[in-house]
Amino acid sequence: MNRRIRQSKSLNLPTYPGEYIYIPDMLVAIVALANYSSQYDGKYSTTVNMWVERAKKEWIDKETGLVASFLEVYNDSIRIVLPVKGSYSALNCYYLSLVDPEFAKEQYDCLMKNYKQGFPFAGIKEYHDRTCLFGMDIDAGPIIFNLSPSGTAFAIGCATSLDDMEFRNKLLKTAELGGSTVTWFGKSHYLLANLALVGEAIVLAMRTSAPKTRM
């Protein structure tokens, strides 16, 4: 994986052949390389640092200040593809918190500025530039009162990693409203998970995120 990334002029690989580069997917690779490097004498740390620096300099959306959701390779150059989505931005921020906490905090501040919603429910909007009270998004799922279910879940991980406990608690209240915790024989899970199991797994991962474990 490191070899293929370094062989790419953009330091990015497409998730699917012939499609855009999905930045959250690339960040999975970068986090994996960073984790490996932390245990094996920084073996791939140069690649990780190069990628993060390119992201800071070349892949920032001017309007929101956030790392792009999508990139497109065009001839020998690479360009940002709009829109910058709340779900992708929250996931980008979470992964960055595991690689470069300082940059992640900058991204988190931009996420809060452009996508944070406090009323009627705390969460992350999928779109920063338009209202969507009810709709369906191919990435985020059902949009309700502007909120992105995926973005809101991923933001729990951002808030946990970056120690924003005030907003984290508000997000967990929203998750409870949407998921409805039930307890049976000493075990708890979201009732909604009977229909959306992946959502429960994501929330569990996000609320127990590094650097500290909190339930």
Per-region residue spans from a language model:
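Extended ligand-binding clefts on enzyme/binding-domain cores
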Residues: 8-11, 19-150
